[in-house]
């Protein structure tokens, strides 16, 4: 698994690709998909072709020029800043999943210093990906829920009083 940092426009591209993946799930989840041109859909070359068991899928993004308005460097200006990393899995679509990681345990105060009387916590969103599974010459696809950390927020700590 490879990890790299990702910022603004790349994050938007990831989100758009995720939505695209969800759009074709009703077709792809019900079928075995042989070679379609994208390496995600390719079976081993030694496997015989499956007659009538294919579909064409254009994974290009429609209206890619429409940008989602995002504030610049929101991950650095937050009172609970975070970094973006990308995980790579060739048997998952999308193969790249962006995750946020909180930079601090505490929150950043008005003076720019960490305040440990507050807690920086991850904001998580459950999303669907497509998982490719090989069983001999058979390739199947299955929906998988993944928990993606999309940012961090500052909260008051939970204090338990011992009696």
UniProtKB/Swiss-Prot annotation:
Expressed in T-helper 1 and T-helper 2 cells, basophils and mast cells. It comes from the Eukaryota. The keyword Iron does not apply. Keywords: Adaptive immunity, Cytokine, Disease variant, Disulfide bond, Glycoprotein, Immunity, Inflammatory response, Innate immunity, Secreted, Signal. Disulfide bonds join 102-152, 107-154. It is linked to Candidiasis, familial, 6: A primary immunodeficiency disorder with altered immune responses and impaired clearance of fungal infections, selective against Candida. It is characterized by persistent and/or recurrent infections of the skin, nails and mucous membranes caused by organisms of the genus Candida, mainly Candida albicans. Homodimer; disulfide-linked. Heterodimer with IL17A (IL17A-IL17F). Forms complexes with IL17RA and IL17RC receptors with 2:1 binding stoichiometry: two receptor chains for one interleukin molecule. IL17F homodimer forms predominantly complexes with IL17RC homodimer, whereas IL17A-IL17F favors complexes with IL17RA-IL17RC. IL17RA and IL17RC chains cannot distinguish between IL17A and IL17F molecules, potentially enabling the formation of topologically distinct complexes. Effector cytokine of innate and adaptive immune system involved in antimicrobial host defense and maintenance of tissue integrity. IL17A-IL17F signals via IL17RA-IL17RC heterodimeric receptor complex, triggering homotypic interaction of IL17RA and IL17RC chains with TRAF3IP2 adapter through SEFIR domains. This leads to downstream TRAF6-mediated activation of NF-kappa-B and MAPkinase pathways ultimately resulting in transcriptional activation of cytokines, chemokines, antimicrobial peptides and matrix metalloproteinases, with potential strong immune inflammation. The keyword Signal applies. It comes from Homo sapiens (Human). This is Interleukin-17F. It is found in: Secreted. Glycans are attached at residue 83. Belongs to the IL-17 family. Its main location: secreted. Residues 1-30 form the signal peptide. GO terms for biological process: adaptive immune response; cartilage development; defense response to Gram-negative bacterium; defense response to Gram-positive bacterium; inflammatory response; innate immune response; interleukin-17-mediated signaling pathway; negative regulation of angiogenesis. InterPro entries: Cystine-knot_cytokine, IL-17_chr, IL-17_fam. GO terms for cellular component: extracellular region; extracellular space. One of its GO terms (molecular function) is protein heterodimerization activity.
